[in-house]
Amino acid sequence: MNRLIAFAMLLFAGTIAAQTPRLPKSAASAQDFAPEGWHVYFIENGDLNKDHVDDIAFILQNNDSGSRILGIAFGKKKRGYVLQEQDGGRFIAPKGNTDAFVDMSIQNGTLRFNFLLPGSHAYDNDDSFIFRFQNKRFELIGWERKLRSKKNDRVNEVTSVNFSTQTVIYEDRTKKSETRQKHFDYDRLKSLGEVVPGEFSMNYDKL
């Protein structure tokens, strides 16, 4: 029985791995990174590693299953790109939810992702994650959550966290309309591979 369970687990792991192909180490364009049966769903250009050469962040989508892969590639001075980061869906499609991703952008050397995530029965969460390439990886330097009412689409609360300065700002936009700010201790910045939208959360009062 134990052997059967172990075999089933290996088979399941192999199936998951097969569903998330490994992207090539280098390519001429985002489309050239795409395996057969995949297409470019979203792409952004900009300098992410401060070498004055445009890099790309792109999302590939499977033509049949709709599964997604996030790729980040650094541009080469003589054309083409070198793959720096690949996410097989854990971040870009948390728990298989491809509807969560809204958009992404590259600004001032940082990579920003916006998600619309299910919250409580009355609210949705507009979550934004900001990463910077440092220490040879993409580290989370900022996070923001807007608590949005399902009833009238109004943003009632905003929590903004700056991990670089270790500062958090909480804004209540209801009738009392107040803003609070404080510093907090944070030992180690998380990498992109350690963050799962919907699971990641920070509470002002608990910092």
Label for each model-derived stretch:
Residues Q19-E36, K78-T98, L207:
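Blade-edge motifs of beta-propeller repeat domains
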Residues N62-S65, G119-H121:
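Short glycine/acidic-enriched loop and turn motifs that connect beta-strands
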Residues R22, G109-L207:
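Acidic, small-residue rich beta-repeat scaffolds with periodic aromatic anchors
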Residues L23, S67-Q86, F131-N135:
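Beta-propeller blade repeat segments, especially FG-GAP/WD-type strand-to-loop junctions
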Residues A13-T15:
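N-terminal signal peptide c-region/cleavage motif recognized by signal peptidases
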Residues V53-I56, S67-I69, D99, Y123-S128:
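Short, surface-exposed coil-to-beta transition loops
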Residues K50-L60, Q107-F115:
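Acidic/hydrophobic-patterned starts of short beta strands in beta-sheet-rich repeat architectures
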Residues H39-L48, D99-T110:
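Beta-propeller blade termini
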